[in-house]
Amino acid sequence: ATCDALSFSSKWLTVNHSACAIHCLTKGYKGGRCVNTICNCRN
């Protein structure tokens, strides 16, 4: 639940998307972003 835990965003930074992307990178994906509260990894 990377997108729930850190879901705060500002004009400059969206922390949940970064956390999701890092989560996906550690799993061998090219990155990812949050869609609602679900972290979607890119292949």
UniProtKB/Swiss-Prot annotation:
Subcellular location: Secreted
Disulfide bond found in the keyword field: yes
GO cellular component: extracellular region
Keywords carried by this UniProt record: Antibiotic, Antimicrobial, Defensin, Disulfide bond, Immunity, Innate immunity, Secreted
Factors inducing expression: By bacterial infection.
Disulphide bond pairs: C3-C34, C20-C39, C24-C41
SMART domains assigned to the protein according to its UniProt record, in alphabetical order: Knot1 (SM00505)
GO biological process: defense response to Gram-negative bacterium; innate immune response
Keyword Secreted found: yes
Broad class of the protein's primary localization: secreted
Cross-referenced InterPro entries: Defensin_invertebrate/fungal, Scorpion_toxin-like, Scorpion_toxin-like_sf
Family: Belongs to the invertebrate defensin family. Type 1 subfamily.
Free-text function comment from the UniProt entry: Antibacterial peptide active against Gram-positive and Gram-negative bacteria.
Protein name, entry field: Defensin
Organism in which the protein naturally occurs: Palomena prasina
